From Swiss-Prot:
Its EC number is 2.7.1.39. Keywords: Amino-acid biosynthesis, ATP-binding, Cytoplasm, Kinase, Nucleotide-binding, Threonine biosynthesis, Transferase. GO terms for molecular function: ATP binding; homoserine kinase activity. ATP binds at P95, Q96, S97, R98, G99, L100, G101, S102, S103, A104, A105. SUPFAM superfamilies: GHMP Kinase, C-terminal domain (SSF55060), Ribosomal protein S5 domain 2-like (SSF54211). Belongs to the GHMP kinase family. Homoserine kinase subfamily. It catalyses: L-homoserine + ATP = O-phospho-L-homoserine + ADP + H(+). The lineage of its organism: Bacteria, Bacillati, Actinomycetota, Actinomycetes, Mycobacteriales. One of its GO terms (biological process) is threonine biosynthetic process. Pathway: Amino-acid biosynthesis; L-threonine biosynthesis; L-threonine from L-aspartate: step 4/5. This is Homoserine kinase. Catalyzes the ATP-dependent phosphorylation of L-homoserine to L-homoserine phosphate.
Length: 309
């Protein structure tokens, strides 16, 4: 029998955004970034109240179909807990549908909030599993849960009847690695951008990406001079360039100047990993073309603060 939690219990969740793929690590590599959403969740006597401020305000639903609410309910179910009602207030800073893990952050925030309300019965592994299930891949969600860089993977059942199993392990990241996000002023649909990908690739391209993922792991951990080589890719970015021409142009411009630039997630954000600041002139050119520039650091894991009634 599920435990009913006390009215008045409240948690505040701070969850980082993330960048997925990092070039070659399609649906595998992720990196938590220092742009954050904050979600306040309180148990109330009845009903559901949802407020959203910042990114997504006026665009996302304010009912039970809101992703944070759905994730809270999934987390409560996994924790074998019930609540009579919920008040959910979202303060969003992660750009929505821009390739910075906004939907994964929402799922992580919801599951983490439920875990805090229920006095933390869920493990990190369970939170990765529950939040990744909303995405269908674990790279963004795992980065937001664990912080830093992650290697993630998915196990599918042979018969296709069981739910996919998601897992991840953290990677140490050199302290001097920073991220610069060039965020265009338009949304990209992950589904639409995935539709342009081929169903099969050549063995030589697969081999190319396997080697670059290995290089990228070494670059993050101990050899940041290899970041440019480690962000090369043949599995998804060449195909997505046709539907994201502005992003592709910026990635190519930056890479031609020696910067480790890549398409962040499904885009449209172009991300640069470096140990030195990007020159002001380059960033000013981006801003003048209508691109928002975010100078970021590698972030830690999701944080949950419990406020007792």
């Amino acid at each position: 029998m599920a435990i009913e939690l006390n009215v008045g219990r409240k948690v505040t969740v701070t969850v980082p955004g993330s960048s997925a793929n990092l070039g070659p690590g399609f649906d595998t590599l992720g990196l938590a970034l220092s742009v954050y959403d904050t979600v306040e969740v309180e148990i109330i006597p009845s009903g559901l109240e949802v407020e959203v401020f910042g990114e997504g305000q006026g665009e996302v639903p304010l009912d039970g179909s809101h992703l944070v609410v759905k994730a809270i309910r999934a987390g409560l179910k996994a924790a074998d807990a019930e609540v009579p009602g919920l008040r959910v207030v979202c303060h969003n800073n992660i750009p929505q549908s821009r390739g910075l893990g906004s939907s994964a952050a929402a799922a992580v925030a919801g599951v983490a909030a439920a875990n805090g309300l229920a006095d933390f019965p869920l493990t990190q592994e369970q939170i990765v599993q529950l939040s990744s299930a909303f995405e269908g891949h674990p790279d963004n969600a795992a980065a937001s849960v664990l912080g830093g860089a992650v290697v993630s993977w998915t196990n599918l059942s042979i018969d296709g009847k069981s739910q996919p199993q998601y897992a991840a392990v953290p990677l140490e990241v050199q302290d001097n690695i920073r991220a610069t996000a060039l965020v265009p002023n338009f949304h990209a649909s992950t589904e639409a951008v995935r539709r342009v990908l081929p169903t099969e690739v050549t063995h030589i391209d697969a081999r190319f990406n396997v080697s670059r993922v290995a290089v990228m792991i070494v670059a993050l951990q101990q050899r940041p001079d290899l970041l440019w080589e480690g962000t090369r890719d043949r599995l998804h970015q060449p195909y997505r360039a046709e539907v994201l021409p502005i992003t592709s142009e910026w990635v190519n411009r930056l890479r031609n100047r020696g910067y480790a630039a890549y398409l962040s997630g499904a885009g449209p954000t172009a991300m640069v990993l470096s140990t030195e600041p990007i020159p002001d002139k380059v960033l000013e050119d981006a801003r003048e073309s209508g691109i928002k520039v975010l100078e970021l650091e590698v972030a830690g894991p999701v944080k949950v603060e419990v406020n007792q009634p």
